[in-house]
Amino acid sequence: MTSTNLDFSQLAADIKLWGRELGFQELGISDTDLSREEMFLQQWLDSGYQGDMDYMARHGTARTRPDELVPGTVRVISVRLNYLPVAARDSWETLDDPDAAFISRYALGRDYHKVMRAKLQALATNVEQRIGDRKSVV
């Protein structure tokens, strides 16, 4: 199927369903006009709120102009994935235990980036199979 004869409302609903099936807690689909957000990001960076996260200021407008990063971009799919393992011990319980070490929550499970990339690639594959004539970038 090509994108010219797709029901885009149904495609959006399917993408959100696939996202839930893959374990994403939230999934949003937006266009590529982030001009308003670009202004807020620049104010945030100018205020130094990024702290030591120097990467936040790198790459100029590539964060807010998706078409500059990947020419031809028409939509952006954003997802949220909790990475706190369900079986993680309560933080305060661990801190109160002199015989236990406290490990940052992000380090308790499998590498978040690997988990996220695999799930995003599965989502991209579903999208590409449905639309046929477009490419997804993870």
Regions found by a protein language model. Give the residues of each.
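Auxiliary alpha/beta "docking" domains used to position bulky ligands
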Residues: M1-V138
